[in-house]
């Protein structure tokens, strides 16, 4: 019962870190990155579909992304979706390809994006702490119901705290890495 609660909590914490990693990857740095388009969706035959499923995305140069839609009829829709996104880029369309030049970030925009990264990291840490709190409640319930002894639950609580600290540290490292990427000129 205790092992199950700890395993469940660790699994959820792992997912929270994965979500944080995905969220941070969508924040644009000064370099071209295919991941920056993962959240952009277009209406494809009535279904909201991510651009990543409708086109191949390549990065031939550090500041250039080339998007080649699988269907030529989708070029205009993809271009419009990118232009209307919050990426701050201006795509050009040559009929079959979309080229996106990634402009240099201004110092002010870099600071803004660092704040955004820290905010996403903080959200992830709150999520991990909530998972810990729920697992602690489960451990207290196990103790109260007499399913496990005081010592076992105490050890499990220490393990849970250690695991929580480990995942919070991972999130801090992700944010620190992203901050370094953003502030690098």
Swiss-Prot record:
GO biological process: translational termination
InterPro entries (UniProt xref): Ribosome_recyc_fac, Ribosome_recyc_fac_dom, RRF_sf
Domain of life: Bacteria
Keyword Cytoplasm: yes
Disulfide bonds: none
Any single Gene Ontology cellular-component annotation: cytoplasm
Keywords: Cytoplasm, Protein biosynthesis
Tagged with keyword Lipid metabolism: no
Any GO molecular function: ribosomal large subunit binding
Gene3D superfamilies (UniProt xref): 3.30.1360.40, Ribosome-recycling factor (1.10.132.20)
Annotated compartments: Cytoplasm
Main localization of the protein described in the UniProt heading: cytoplasm
HAMAP family given in the database record: RRF
NCBIfam families documented for this protein: frr
Family assignment from sequence similarity: Belongs to the RRF family.
Protein's UniProt name: Ribosome-recycling factor
Organism: Mycolicibacterium paratuberculosis (strain ATCC BAA-968 / K-10)
Lineage: Bacteria, Bacillati, Actinomycetota, Actinomycetes, Mycobacteriales
